[in-house]
Amino acid sequence: MSHGVFAYTWDLVGDPDAAARIAGLGADTVTLQAAYHSVRGITPWHPAHRVVHAEHAAAYFRLREDRWPGLRPLAPTWGVENPDRFGTAAAALTAAGLSVEAWLVLTHSSAVGSAYPDVTVRNAYGECYPYALCPSHQLVRDYALTIVSEICAQYDVDLMLEACGWLGFDHGSHHEKTEGADLSTTARRLLSLCFCPACRTALGAEADRLARSVRTAVDAELTGGHPTPVDATALLAHRGTVIADLVRETKSLAGDRRLLLMATDDPWVTGPDVGVDFQSVAPDAFVLKSWGDTAAAARQLKSAAARTDIPLIANVTALDPEWNGVAELLEAGATEVRYYHAGLASKARLNRIRTAITEARR
């Protein structure tokens, strides 16, 4: 049974003790940031910096100029300077006896979306979500697949995919001001449906009717009325087809490498964990977010295990003060665990990860 931890490249590059510290947790695998969205993170252990502000989404692997004919990720300018941060960090982890998974965020990039708004998600009101690249567009699919192919061409690592589909309304933008409207889960999901030109083309005549019904339902809720149900079957089916095709193409590029997919089996879900029918896609493992209430996470794992023979990996967070280990998740059907996050965790939280791994292996 594999126990792995998440880490950022800046946790390792410039810190000669980082790989040994991670290995000392008892982990056998590190899910290492290779293409990632903007973030501000603390680095409790690094000898050269304490706060890293990744101002935009970036590729942390070597960017070969001739491989990007369309959309192109940006390079990072923060942390310890290095022309190949992913490769340097991965080499240190491998030398410490750890396996490496490239952590690839595919369709979440405000930098690319702001430069190319025509390929971003647009809600039923025609409003652009610049952080959300829409994979209905061939340019976006090519961008995602080039990220994967470049990792496979340059490094001998497995792959974990985040945001392998649509992002939606829920994002957490800078100085977010949306909570006062008391939006229901249903309204948030309706505001996450995409009506960009590519999605409209896929839907055909259905697009106008659906967009109109979404606007009517959301407006009714916002004004205190009673929204009527919205039938988005055709759009959800379109999303499922695009995601399944993208996973299949990624799997082909991966070859013998393991392909792990952050996912949920609710087709309405958008975000880091793509909403898919577990019967329609075939990664080597599904990674299920098991944050928050452990009992609820265990029920989710048990339900998923009943519907697929593909292995399930529990993604747990040691950053949650209520986190109480993984025994219940393993009993529910998880075959592996990934712990978030070795670089962000305090000494006490690292000790909790170490204890959880030790107890799970008894």
Show the residue positions of the predicted features:
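Catalytic domains of carbohydrate-active enzymes, especially glycoside hydrolases
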Residues: 16-47, 52-57, 150-158, 276-288, ...
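Glycine-rich, aromatic-flanked loop segments that form ligand/cofactor-binding clefts
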Residues: 29-56, 82-125, 160-168
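Substrate-binding cleft of secreted/luminal carbohydrate-active enzymes
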Residues: 283-297, 308, 313-361
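Active-site clefts of carbohydrate-active enzymes
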Residues: 218-232, 304-324
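The substrate-binding groove and active-site-proximal loops of carbohydrate-active enzymes
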Residues: 3-13, 64-84, 127-142, 232-242, ...
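Polysaccharide-binding and catalytic clefts of secreted carbohydrate-active enzymes
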Residues: 126-253, 258, 263-277
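Aromatic- and acid-rich polysaccharide-binding/catalytic face
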Residues: 32-40, 162, 215, 219-229, ...
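Short, acidic/polar
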Residues: 11-24, 138-151, 267-281, 297-300, ...
